[in-house]
Amino acid sequence: TGKKVPTCHRSSFDSVLEDSDFEQACENADGIARKVYREEAKEIEEIRKGIIEVSGKEQPYDIFICYKETDENGDRTIDSVIAQDVYDALTAKGYRVFFSRITLEDKLGREYEPYIFAALNSAKIMLAFGTDFEYFNAVWVKNEWSRYLKLMASDKSKHLIPCYKDIDAYDMPKEFAKLQAQDMGKVGAIQDLL
């Protein structure tokens, strides 16, 4: 049809229609551009409302596990394997854990954002796994942990624990500099997280 269909990978409780940057863009645009901006913003708003509706039906999570699932060859990463071991240990203890490999398994063919949005907003702890600086900064991984850091700024009950292995703690993203990290290469690391 040639029609643009917006997708959202970073939802918010706030409407784009009420965003000061959007309002400024409309103010500075000519009449035609302003009309296009408003029409597209209305479409985005409908998508956002749908995401909020779906996410509102989700049960809250205790913990969100953030990691890179596959490498550049499409093979499973060691991050994913370590994260699954931690997931198994946490769920065995009765925690409700968001782990995309399992949590999103039955959501094939649907947008993942409503479920990620719900989990990020409800989880009190995020465990961000990385065995490589590039994995911590992979697009989807950084999308999740950066959103969580923003939530932490306004909710002091939330905590992010970077979990690293085979890299120097100083090679983690600079945003993690003031966070207590867990070296997953040391004996008993999983038990320490529990």
Report the location of each language-model feature.
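Hydrophobic/aromatic beta-strand patches that form the interior of the parallel beta-sheet core
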Residues: 127, 161-163, 182
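Membrane-associated lipid acylation/remodeling enzymes share a hydrophobic transmembrane-juxtamembrane segment
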Residues: 1, 141-165
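Active-site regions of enzymes building and remodeling cell-envelope glycoconjugates
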Residues: 10-14, 176-184
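Short glycine-rich, flexible loops that bind phosphorylated cofactors or substrates
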Residues: 134-136
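Glycine-rich, charge-decorated loop segments at or immediately adjacent to ligand/cofactor-binding or catalytic sites
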Residues: 2-7, 162, 167-179
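Flexible loop residues that form catalytic
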Residues: 131-132, 168
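Short, glycine/charged-enriched secondary-structure capping and boundary segments
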Residues: 78-79, 113, 141-144, 175-179
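Conserved N-terminal substructure of TIR/SEFIR domains
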Residues: 15, 20-129, 149-159, 187-194
